Design a protein with these regions (language model features):
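Surface-exposed extracellular loop regions of Gram-negative outer-membrane beta-barrel proteins
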Residues: 85-132, 153-178
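Transmembrane beta-barrel strands of outer-membrane/channel proteins
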Residues: 21, 37-43, 89-95, 137, ...
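Signature of Gram-negative outer-membrane beta-barrel scaffolds
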Residues: 1-84, 110
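Outer membrane beta-barrel strand-and-loop segments of large Gram-negative receptors
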Residues: 9, 122, 126, 146-208
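Transmembrane beta-barrel outer-membrane domains
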Residues: 12-18, 66-72, 116-118, 126-130, ...
Length: 209
């Protein structure tokens, strides 16, 4: 029954339309610094209909149709400095987004009377936006090889988690467990990356074949 229940609730209708435009600008400073900048605009329009399920009555009903729309401007900048033929430095800044899953957005209600639990969707979810900074330095060996070091930092806004509340009242009824996806807040990630590549064919030429 639980499998059938999940299939009924997850059976929804959704339509997403994304209209986008992009502009790009390239410029070379002197002979060793290159700039590439861009701006992407995305307009997202959503329309969806979910289902409500109550295991006490074993009935499923359609919810009303919900609509939502939003606009995002996503800039990107990349700078490359050719210090010399063997040494390169790169820096970049980008904004990216991740849209909520349809199953989290649809206004569905799933009531489990046996365990006194309720799960509902959240049509007010916002997309997750990531602000990304990257800096790297690459050194190329003349004898075919590369050593690279990099630093990255990401600031993430409105990431999505399942909010779980206990003994929560919803529409006049108290439930032991209430679950709903929500935009939780912000997160910060950073890290270092190192890599080393080298052609070791000079040790054992037979390894090339």
């Amino acid at each position: 029954k639980e499998q059938v229940q999940a299939e009924l609730v997850e059976n929804f209708e959704a339509r997403e339309t994304v209209s986008s435009g992009y502009v790009r600008f390239d410029h070379k400073f002197a002979s060793d610094i290159n700039l590439m900048a861009g701006l992407r605009m995305e307009h997202t329009s959503l329309r969806y209909t979910g289902r409500n399920y109550d295991d006490e009555t074993d009935k499923t009903t359609k919810t009303g149709r919900m609509t939502n729309s939003y606009v995002n401007f996503l800039p990107s900048i990349l700078v490359k400095w050719d210090v010399n033929d063997d040494f390169k430095i790169r820096g970049s800044y980008t904004q990216t987004l991740s849209r909520p899953k349809y199953s989290a957005l649809v206004p569905s209600v799933n009531i489990n009377r046996g365990d006194n639990e309720i799960k509902i969707g959240n049509s007010d979810l916002k997309p997750t936006i990531s602000y990304n900074f990257d800096l790297s330095a690459d050194y190329y060996f003349k004898s075919v090889g590369l050593v690279s070091a990099g630093f990255f930092y990401k600031k993430i806004d409105d990431f999505i988690v399942d909010q779980v509340l206990t003994n929560y009242e919803y529409q006049g009824t108290e439930y032991t467990r209430f679950t709903q996806p929500k935009n939780a807040g912000n997160a910060n990630l950073w890290g270092l990356e190192f890599s080393y590549q080298r052609d070791f064919g000079f040790i054992a030429p037979a390894l090339k074949y």
